[in-house]
């Protein structure tokens, strides 16, 4: 007997959860399948535990670098990593509970087993078959290991969250969000941390002026940055340390190696070949602007599509899809332009819109005007442990429409959301100029640039 539903969701990560709940709220009969813990990468081994670790690193920086400058005589007896890890997991468990209550409230059925396609409209789970006219694939992605000898001795970002103590010496290899964030956290928590990147700098998709500030701060406070370094071999030593060799002749011996070289879509192991769904050249599932795959009635969103691997993107795309399918909003879709993002580095980076480099490439240098301001945030300005901050606006044309806003520094992570609304609405430099600043704050720099 085949069980019939209106909507089948394969994958209980951020996108799948959001779409399932929204569909059920509109009266659809929904069932969700997830073979691991609900919440996907973000909640379990991604942005949520990462942010907890970043907060821990911020506390460490406050105690060691800034407390004395504010007159506090602080003696640190010890740092109990086990306490941080246990409290982090307890927080994640509470999120799991919140998800379950949401499912119950909205009437979303769920089976915590892996689903496998039998045909384009039927899946099989634990011997039972389920069918629906609409099936969403939201299976996410997973971290990659390089194809070099000894790569198995390293761990990925998933393994980072399994650590029981802060390694004495750590090598993080990669140049994206995850690499920069993990390296920054471990450095702040006391590990002798080295970040290796293949090219001239990390975060190459971000504005160069902003990244240059981060690189300068790394040179001053860590982690140690190594550029133009491609790992070629990893050897495990008798004392369990690891020696890593690079193609530039460099070697380093560490206690922990973390690979953060990228992620790839989860497209195998659930019978996708039975559906006829097409993949892109990168191995992700092709989906159009409405999240339709190449097969009618099958949809895909989130990391499995490789569009923008950000949790809020998957959540918004999932909700918009359900609005279209189950609430008669035929044009509902996610606008993938001007999506704000933050890197929880030290100091933090925020960005929305085009970088200066991309703006010039798209519109021509003669049509672009850039405004920039650099300063020391007040919080770090009382003593010698000063952190830099740089804010930047990229404008287009005579009316100076703001097409890019970028910043690095204390509090930027909480500033960027509000400014992204203004940019989404088409704000100009004049609009910013006509806004009265809040003083003293870092955000006032964005509305007082000349």
Predicted regions located by residue number:
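FAD-site-proximal beta/loop scaffold in flavoenzymes
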Residues: 151-167, 251-328
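Glycine-rich dinucleotide-binding loop and its adjacent helix/turn
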Residues: 47, 137-192, 224-225, 273-275, ...
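A Rossmann-like FAD-binding core segment of flavoenzymes
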Residues: 112, 116-124, 189-289, 329, ...
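A conserved FAD-binding loop/helix module that cradles the flavin
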Residues: 210, 301-360, 431, 439-450
């Amino acid at each position: 007997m085949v069980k019939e539903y209106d909507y089948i969701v394969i994958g209980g990560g951020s996108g799948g959860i959001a779409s399932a709940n929204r569909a059920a709220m509109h009266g659809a009969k929904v069932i969700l399948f997830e073979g691991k813990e609900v919440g996907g990468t973000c909640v379990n081994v991604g942005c949520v535990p990462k942010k907890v670790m970043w907060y821990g690193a911020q506390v460490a920086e406050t105690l060691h670098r800034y407390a004395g400058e504010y007159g506090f005589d602080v003696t640190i007896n010890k740092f109990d990593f086990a306490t941080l890890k246990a409290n982090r997991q307890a927080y994640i468990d509470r999120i799991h509970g919140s998800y379950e209550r949401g499912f119950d409230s909205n009437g979303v059925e769920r089976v915590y087993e892996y689903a496998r396609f039998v045909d384009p409209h039927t899946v099989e789970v634990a011997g039972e078959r389920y069918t629906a006219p609409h099936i969403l694939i939201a299976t996410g992605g997973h971290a990659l290991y390089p194809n070099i000898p000894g790569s198995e001795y390293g761990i990925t970002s998933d393994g980072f969250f399994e650590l029981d103590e802060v390694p004495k010496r750590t090598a993080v290899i990669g140049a994206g969000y995850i690499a920069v964030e993990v390296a920054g956290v471990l450095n702040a928590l006391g590990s002798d941390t080295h970040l290796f990147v293949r090219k001239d700098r990390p975060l190459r998709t971000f504005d160069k002026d902003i990244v240059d500030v981060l690189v300068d701060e790394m040179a001053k406070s860590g982690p140690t940055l190594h550029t133009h370094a491609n790992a070629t071999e990893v050897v495990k030593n008798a004392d369990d340390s690891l020696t890593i060799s690079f193609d530039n002749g460099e070697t380093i011996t560490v206690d922990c190696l973390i690979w953060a070289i990228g992620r790839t879509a989860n497209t195998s192991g659930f019978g996708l070949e039975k559906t006829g769904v097409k993949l892109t050249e990168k191995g992700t599932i092709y989906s159009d602007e409405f999240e339709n795959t190449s097969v009618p009635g099958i949809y895909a969103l989130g990391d499995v599509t490789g569009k923008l691997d950000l949790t809020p993107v998957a959540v918004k795309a999932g909700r918009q899809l359900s609005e279209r399918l189950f609430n008669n909003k035929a044009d509902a879709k996610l606008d993938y332009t001007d999506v704000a993002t933050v890197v929880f580095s030290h100091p933090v980076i925020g960005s929305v819109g085009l970088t200066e480099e991309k703006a010039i490439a798209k519109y021509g240098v003669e049509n672009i005007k850039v405004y920039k301001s650099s300063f020391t945030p007040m919080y770090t300005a009382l003593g010698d442990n000063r952190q830099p901050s740089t804010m930047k606006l990229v404008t287009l044309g005579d009316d100076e429409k703001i097409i890019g806003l970028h910043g690095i520094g204390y509090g930027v992570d909480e500033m960027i959301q509000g400014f992204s609304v203004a940019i989404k609405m088409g704000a100009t430099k004049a609009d910013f100029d006509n806004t009265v600043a809040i003083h003293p704050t870092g955000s006032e720099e964005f509305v007082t640039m000349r």
